[in-house]
């Protein structure tokens, strides 16, 4: 009706407020996690219960890091992304706050969630969480990554590193060459876990990112608790691709719903046949 008013709300974690703080600063003799923690604590007043670092590696101190004209959110996201640290958000039900969790390995994934594949039809039981409209996309990605840099203090040192994480996978092709990742040592390319911030470390990290784009999945679910950072497995018949059956990591969610009209008090329109429908994106 003409008297009807629509409202829109955007719900974001508290960390989103960091994009309102633009700074020019220099950080000396600190590692990436130390710089991030310093910004969260000293500049934004966050306390220990507001964030959690669950890291499996020890990151070296950098002589100098500059923040020039970047907002704090973009700055820490860039720094964390350089070394492969990712973050997600969880809820502390005791303190009633959101918590930012920073991780650098698969140990940070939340596992154990399994949902059935049930297409939306009259046979679907009300209130049963399910997955449908599953789709997979595949593409050819780079076969290996080469990195190169220059350390003026050891001008004759070999700073080349070449990594193929798949060790000869035939479905990949080509080489990605990266110069100037700003590392001081080449590292061991044969080590599965090379020294953090070495040439082999950056080469392996970059190749893993390319491989993450090799297979992408999308689906729709009615599960209200599913969120990025969780590993989802789907059970069912032939409609379930092997990637979903083996487990996929959820990287993005898009949720929407409609107001119910069953009680006669809602005049906005017909009842949504799939309340709480959520579109998810994932990779294997």
Question: Whereabouts are the PLM-identified features?
Answer:
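Amphipathic alpha-helical and helix-coil boundary elements used as assembly
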Residues: 1-284
């Amino acid at each position: 009706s003409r008297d009807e008013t629509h409202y829109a709300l955007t719900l974001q974690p508290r960390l989103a407020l960091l994009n309102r703080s633009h700074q020019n600063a220099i950080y000396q003799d600190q590692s990436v996690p130390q710089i991030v923690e310093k910004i969260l604590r000293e500049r934004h007043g966050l306390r220990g219960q507001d964030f959690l670092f669950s890291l499996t590696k020890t990151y070296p101190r950098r002589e100098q890091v500059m923040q020039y004209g970047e907002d704090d959110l973009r700055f820490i996201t860039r720094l964390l992304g350089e070394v492969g640290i990712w973050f997600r958000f969880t809820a502390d039900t005791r303190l009633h706050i959101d918590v930012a969790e920073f991780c650098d390995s698969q140990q940070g994934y939340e596992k154990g969630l399994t949902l059935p594949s049930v297409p939306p039809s009259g046979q679907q039981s009300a209130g049963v969480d399910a997955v449908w409209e599953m789709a997979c996309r595949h593409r050819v990605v780079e076969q290996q990554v080469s990195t190169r840099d220059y350390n003026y203090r050891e001008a004759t040192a070999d700073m080349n590193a070449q990594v193929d994480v798949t060790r000869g996978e035939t479905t990949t092709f080509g080489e990605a060459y990266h110069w100037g990742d700003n590392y001081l040592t080449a590292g061991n390319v044969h080590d599965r876990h090379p020294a953090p911030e070495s040439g082999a470390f950056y080469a392996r990290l970059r190749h893993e990112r390319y491989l993450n784009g090799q297979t992408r999945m999308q689906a729709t679910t009615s599960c209200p608790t599913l969120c990025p950072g969780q590993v989802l497995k789907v059970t069912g018949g032939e409609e379930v691709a092997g990637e979903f059956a083996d487990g996929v990591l959820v990287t993005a969610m898009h949720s929407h719903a409609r107001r119910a009209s069953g009680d006669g008090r809602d005049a906005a329109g017909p009842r949504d046949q799939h309340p709480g429908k959520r579109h998810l994106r994932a990779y294997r």
